[in-house]
UniProtKB/Swiss-Prot annotation:
Phosphorylated by ATK1; the phosphorylation stabilizes its interaction with RAB11A and RAB11B. Residues 254-270 have a biased composition (Basic and acidic residues). This is WD repeat-containing protein 44. Residues 108-158, 202-273, 309-341, 391-418, 454-474, 552-587 are annotated as: Disordered. Residues 203-249 are annotated as: Important for interaction with ARHGAP26 AND ARHGAP10. Residues 225-248 have a biased composition (Pro residues). GO terms for molecular function: molecular sequestering activity; small GTPase binding. Residues 108-120, 148-157 have a biased composition (Polar residues). The modification Phosphotyrosine is found at Y474. It comes from Rattus norvegicus. WD repeats lie at residues 504-543, 600-638, 640-680, 685-724, 735-774, 779-818.
Amino acid sequence: MMPLKMCTWGGSYPVGSPGKVGLLSFKETKNTGNKAGNESPVQELRQDVSKKIIECIIEESQKVLQLEDDSLDSKGKGLSDQATASHSVAGTEFSNIPGLLAIQHELQQGSRKADSQNAAEETELETQKCFPSDNNCEKSEKTEDETNNLTEVSSADQLDASKLETEILNKEAVEVKEGDVVNPASSDALSTKDFAAVEEVAPAKPPRHLTPEPDIVASTKKPVPARPPPPTNFPPPRPPPPSRPAPPPRKKKSDLEFEALKTPDLDVPKDNIASDSLLTTNMASESTVRDSLPSLDLASATSGDKIVTAQENGKAPDVQTVAGEVMGPQRPRSNSGRELTDEEILASVMIKNLDTGEEIPLSLAEEKLPTGINPLTPLTLHIMRRTKEYVSNDATQSDDEEKLQSQQTDTDGGRLKQKTTQLKKFLGKSVKRAKHLAEEYGERAINKVKSVRDEVFHTDQDDPSSSDDEGMPYTRPVKFKAAHGFKGPYDFDQIKVVQDLSGEHMGAVWTMKFSHCGRLLASAGQDNIVRIWALKNAFDYFNNMRMKYNTEGRVSPSPSQESLSSSKSDTDMGVCSGTDEDPDDKNAPFRQRPFCKYKGHTADLLDLSWSKNYFLLSSSMDKTVRLWHISRRECLCCFQHIDFVTAIAFHPRDDRYFLSGSLDGKLRLWNIPDKKVALWNEVDGQTKLITAANFCQNGKYAVIGTYDGRCIFYDTEHLKYHTQIHVRSTRGRNKVGRKITGIEPLPGENKILVTSNDSRIRLYDLRDLSLSMKYKGYVNSSSQIKASFSHDFTYLVSGSEDKYVYIWSTYHDLSKFTSVRRDRNDFWEGIKAHNAVVTSAIFAPNPSLMLSLDVQSEKLEGIDKYEDAEVLDNTSTGIVKTDNTEVLLSADFTGAQCFYVKNSFLYP
């Protein structure tokens, strides 16, 4: 058989010496110098040689396959002729391969298997010699001299070319389907046995009927090299990681949490919503998707944690931060490390009188401040310590009151009253200083001091109600006064007191709220207890409701120890039952004893809020908000804050949410069923004290009032800043904003009523943020007094620091006043039934419920008798009144509570 002539780069080897091509030995240590100099050219030559050799081998293998197809189809004669022709035509250096393969296929068909096995064994031995493994590297280096005797390489280029040829042959052998390794690396690899082995391990040709495309097209496709099997000494491949589930699609705006709360005109542009918002809409909609109830119920209110901490954005605050905020600042120490006493701390804090500029230590402020006229509330004292300022009562005394008092005449002692007025100014309206003066001047001065006391406290010596020991008689008239220049007719000059609830509250009553139905009244204040009062005609209904949920003293599941003790103390103190005798008059609307008492707070209560289904929220100076229900005795949930909670409000349309404002400067919208903060925002500015909060426009906006006189509006859907109003006068001492004490919406007119510590009440139009009306006449310099509307929004009422209850008409009656400013209302009516600061005054939301059946029958007869009572009261805003009955409630600094009824023919 003729030897095969190999095609190489840079020349061809002699035909008679194929051994130099087959057996190669890598002399890396000896040829380092040559390789270093020719490294880059050799790499380029390797790439070119590899490409050309691969193309030659692929082309020849395709020709072999074509010849085999032709030989199967043709006869024996044609087969021999084609083999001879293909052998004689040799266009390239590998032209002898098809002829040799064809001859070997016919002549040595019987001995192919044996020869191929021998060839494979010899090839494996030669391959191990030429390509030693990593484990046999040392052995290959030891036998380097023996290999050099068998192989001679003339130059570095020939060595590289031979190496490339060997690698290409190895790649061709790997492509075999059986996986046998065939490496023609020796001179025997060029023998006829190797050709037979290559022919045997060549890829099997598929049947003709399975080959849809022509041979020409198939010959142009290069076979894909098979991937060699992984080494056995390596671990199995790591399985692919589990596929992460696709994120859920973003919810539409209609599916957000507060979409149900939106009004048609509450459309916040998307551009105005920052991407780094305090709480995204997806976070805000986590709970509402699960909630399908339109309002709060007992099941959702009692589920979950009983104590909820303020966690904004769903992140729990740091433990150290919470501990420091809850425990408050540590007691200051001296330079030597000793803790300062209370007296030293008070002496170190300086308070500045904004009117006179005088600075005094806080330890002496009690003597300087007017304790007799305007006792400071605990909240006011706390804010004063933080802001280091106070406002004297003299500066904020109403001008109208001074004018009125100057015109008052006393037939028995007009000259004495003039002297006492001068003495008041000299003494600074301080009874304590007057007593010191009385000790010096004897009995005569004592008599003057008593007169001063009567004048300062607006008490009458002949009035039996001035005595603390005697009870207030029912249906008795009260002291009435009106603004200077207001000549009448008056609306409340015939008002009478019908019930006195003094004796229950121990200390001041800071807040009172009627339920939406008007049958329940909640009052709370300095004694840390919430008291619920029920109307006589509604007592049985609520008592049956309580008995339904508290049969045999049963309380809610998993109550806290505090709740159990609260229930026990509530029962021991004897809450009124249906069988109790009520000694009061039949005209009294409420029972004389509370329906129930809620205990749990550890400091003064500041605000209350009712839901439409008899849930009650209470906020306190103990930095908590507690949730109650009229059918339960214990606290349902406690919401903890960072600082004093000054204001709370249920959402008007979805009482699963409520708003809370705190002195820490944060406004929070709580989700009661989920027991978490749904949305929150923080006030900007130097003074971040929130002193009032409420909803307006039926829940469209949340409004807060600050200590520096700002009303800030936030859209409820995202609790984002909307706008603000700076509540202050344009000139005078009130041009600096004062503390906002109350915010009340005026439904149907897009207006809000703002009460502030500058002794002014303002009505703002939310359409253009303009001032619609300013009311003045009362005194509110440092208290938490707030004004509120009547049930039909015709009147507004407020307590005062001068012990009077002040009432204004919401709008001027043009039939009474001809030339008045439409944006000023100085025409007030005042009633007096208290001997201390009136801390709270409200109208009853449903006056008809306050009257018994007998009184209502008398009312019908009275309407027929007094037809003037049905005269329509047409005001400038179109408010029409069909009933002039009004019921008021007021409370003072001593805990006394009085009920008033305005209707002349009901109580003669």
